[in-house]
Amino acid sequence: MATLHLMVGLPGSGKTTEAKKLEIEYQALRLTPDEWHLYLFGNDFYNDEAKDYEHNERHSKIEKLMWDIAEKSLLLGVDVILDFGCWTKIERDDFRLKAHSLGVKFKIHYMNCSLETIWERLKERNQDSKNTTVFYISKESMVEWNNVFEVPTEEELTQL
């Protein structure tokens, strides 16, 4: 039976690194929106709410398209890794319900990482001028996102 693997955590917490390992371990289809977004639209993220509307709209469309691909793959018996972040319990519950409605297993992979460690990783990523695989993220954006992020409960992590 296929499994929907959901990567949960903030940018810089290690989601994509772990997702790449799981992709090999489970011979799964890994869907990482940032990779598609950068390929299709380049780096159009400005860390400015007023300027980032189009970026956010494009990102949402990519995630919807990825879900369509994930759904078809799961029905074919292929494990899928959604590397979306899923910052809120409502988002995670939605994917759990979708998995159950398809008759597949569901697993959350939570990247529990301190804000200090995340910021150190992001600073390094942000300074790499050759890095075209990730978006530049400001400390202000990171602090704001950390305030929005809902840490999964133990019950949520063990619930199938």
What are these regions (language model features)?
Residues 17-78:
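Conserved substrate/cofactor phosphate-moiety recognition/catalytic segment
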Residues 74, 86-127, 144:
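ATP-dependent NMP and nucleoside kinases share a basic, alpha-helical "lid"
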Residues 7:
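Hydrophobic anchor at the beta1->P-loop junction of P-loop NTPases
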Residues 1-2, 73:
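Phosphate-binding P-loop
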Residues 2-4, 13, 17, 21, ...:
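Conserved GTP-binding G-domain of TRAFAC-class P-loop NTPases and closely related GTPase folds
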Residues 78-87, 155-160:
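Phosphate-binding beta-loop-alpha motif at adenosine-nucleotide cofactor sites
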Residues 56-63, 67, 112, 139-146:
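Amphipathic alpha-helical transducer elements in NTP-driven molecular machines
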